[in-house]
Regions:
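Noncatalytic linker/hinge segments flanking ATPase motor cores
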Residues: 1, 50-62, 111-123
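Charged, low-complexity, helix/coiled-coil-prone segments
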Residues: 1-11, 29-45, 137-143
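Short HxH-centered metal-ligating active-site micro-motif
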Residues: 1-19, 56, 60-62, 68
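A conserved C-terminal secondary-structure "cap"
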Residues: 70-149
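Short, intrinsically disordered, mixed-charge
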Residues: 3, 27, 64-67, 95-98
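Alpha-helical context
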Residues: 21, 34, 38, 42, ...
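Class I SAM-dependent methyltransferase SAM-binding "motif I" and its flanking Rossmann-like core
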Residues: 14-54, 58
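A contiguous pocket-lining binding segment that forms or flanks enzyme active sites
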Residues: 40-94
Length: 149
C-alpha cells in the first residue's frame, strides 16, 4: 500500500469489535454522524473473499481498491487507514472504527445530505481532526507525546 500510495507515510489496521461485524455487512459507511462525515467520499470498500491477506498480490489489490482514499473497509475483515503520518493514520482508524460502531447501533439512521456531509468534512479537516484524535488518545493513555513520535 505504501509503495502504491507515495503520499501516505503510515497505514493502520486492526481487528476491532465494531469493525469486523460492520465489514461483514458489505457496505460503505454513510454520513450518519459528525465523525462519519470525515470519510464521506474518502473511503472505499474492498469486496474480496481473501480475508487472510497472505500475498503481495492481495496487498496490491487492496492498494488498488483504496485508490486515493484515506480509508478502506475490508470485506469480512476490518478496516485500514492511511495518513501523512502515524497520527493521521491511527487517529483516522480509531475514528472510522467508532463510525462503524455507530452504524451497527443506529440501524435506521438517516444520512446527512451530501452538502452537509461535505461542509462538516471540510471543517473537520481544517481542524486536523484525525491528528487531534490521535494526540487525545496519547495524552490520555501515555501522557508523554514524545514517547510515541
Amino acid at each position: 500500500i505504501l509503495r502504491t500510495r507515495t503520499d501516505a507515510v503510515s497505514a493502520a489496521t486492526c481487528t476491532r469489535a465494531g469493525a469486523r461485524p460492520f465489514s461483514a455487512e458489505c457496505r460503505p459507511v454513510e454520513p450518519i454522524t459528525q465523525e462519519a462525515c470525515m470519510f464521506f467520499e474518502d473511503h472505499a470498500f474492498f469486496d474480496d473473499e481473501e480475508v487472510q491477506v497472505q500475498s503481495v498480490e492481495a496487498g496490491q489489490r487492496i492498494a488498488d481498491a483504496l485508490g486515493d482514499n484515506r480509508a478502506i473497509v475490508l470485506r469480512s475483515h476490518g478496516l485500514l487507514t492511511v495518513g501523512a503520518g502515524v497520527p493521521e493514520a491511527v487517529g483516522g482508524f480509531v475514528q472510522l472504527e467508532r463510525v462503524c460502531e455507530a452504524h451497527l447501533k443506529a440501524r435506521e439512521a438517516k444520512p446527512l445530505s451530501p452538502e452537509a456531509a461535505r461542509f462538516a468534512k471540510q471543517d473537520l479537516e481544517r481542524l486536523n481532526a484525525h491528528r487531534g484524535a490521535f494526540f487525545s488518545m496519547v495524552d490520555r493513555h501515555v501522557g508523554d507525546r514524545t514517547a510515541v513520535l
